[in-house]
């Protein structure tokens, strides 16, 4: 019997589950809420496949259910599904609220990391300190400073102008625009127009809902 290939990361396990159970897991886009107790169902269904262990399955499930796209799918009225995509009851309010808090905390962490990175870039490098002259050492005569020429003025680069998005209803799925993050604007693509704003996908692959005031062309 030939040895089966081994999946080395949780992302590879998720990709395998999305292919093995396409009506339950998804590799991209909004994810559907999973049935409570689906871990045991997975153990029973994929035991021995791809040399998967329970630890790998548990880690992959934890990564999948903590992703932004999964938390976006945990909303009022959504239905949990089993491995075959069969409905397993609606989400209760407690789980919806828990997912909302997780999503807010994740967004706050990302914003804090970006702010910290921008602050580090703005920090000036400390000036090197000159060693103090030893007592009794002769002072060297100061050299006359050469006449300094007036520095040439360098024109500051023109800031890129952006047009704010005034009406999100005029946007279309697949349209390219930018998301303002502090002083920067990141390229993004429209995925969906929702009542809370616009769901976009950044070039990094991350998808999030953004209000109109943070969108520009």
From Swiss-Prot:
GO biological process: post-transcriptional regulation of gene expression
Predominant localisation class: cytoplasm
Record InterPro entries: ProQ (IPR023529), ProQ/FinO (IPR016103), ProQ/FinO_sf (IPR036442), ProQ_C (IPR035236)
Region (Disordered): 105-166
Basic and acidic residues compositional bias, start-end: 132-162
Official protein name in the record: RNA chaperone ProQ
Keyword Phosphoprotein: no
Function description: RNA chaperone with significant RNA binding, RNA strand exchange and RNA duplexing activities. May regulate ProP activity through an RNA-based, post-transcriptional mechanism.
Highest taxon in the source lineage: Bacteria
GO molecular function, one term: RNA strand-exchange activity
Bias kind Basic residues: ranges: 121-131
Classification of source organism: Bacteria, Pseudomonadati, Pseudomonadota, Gammaproteobacteria, Enterobacterales
Gene: proQ
Localization annotation: Cytoplasm
Family membership: Belongs to the ProQ family.
Keyword RNA-binding: yes
Keywords, comma-separated and alphabetical: Chaperone, Cytoplasm, RNA-binding
GO cellular component, one term: cytosol
């Amino acid at each position: 019997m030939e040895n089966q290939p081994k999946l080395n990361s949780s992302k590879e396990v998720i990709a395998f589950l999305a292919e093995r159970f396409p009506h339950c897991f998804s590799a991209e886009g909004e994810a559907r809420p999973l049935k409570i107790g689906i871990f045991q169902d997975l153990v029973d269904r994929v035991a021995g496949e791809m040399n998967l262990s329970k630890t790998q399955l548990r880690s992959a499930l934890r990564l999948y259910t903590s992703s932004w796209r999964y938390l976006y799918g945990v909303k009022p009225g959504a239905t949990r599904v089993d491995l075959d995509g069969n409905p397993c009851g609606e989400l209760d309010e407690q789980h919806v609220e828990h997912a909302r808090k997780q999503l807010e905390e994740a967004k706050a962490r990302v914003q804090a990391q970006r702010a910290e990175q921008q602050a580090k870039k703005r920090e000036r490098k400390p000036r090197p300190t000159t060693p103090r002259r030893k007592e009794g050492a002769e002072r060297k005569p100061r050299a006359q400073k050469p006449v300094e020429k007036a520095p040439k003025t360098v024109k500051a680069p023109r800031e890129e102008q952006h047009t704010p998005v005034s009406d999100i209803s005029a946007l279309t799925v697949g349209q390219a625009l930018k998301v303002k993050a502090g002083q920067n604007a990141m390229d993004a693509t429209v995925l969906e127009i929702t009542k809370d704003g616009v769901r976009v996908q950044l070039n990094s692959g991350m998808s999030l809902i953004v209000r109109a005031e943070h969108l520009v062309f």
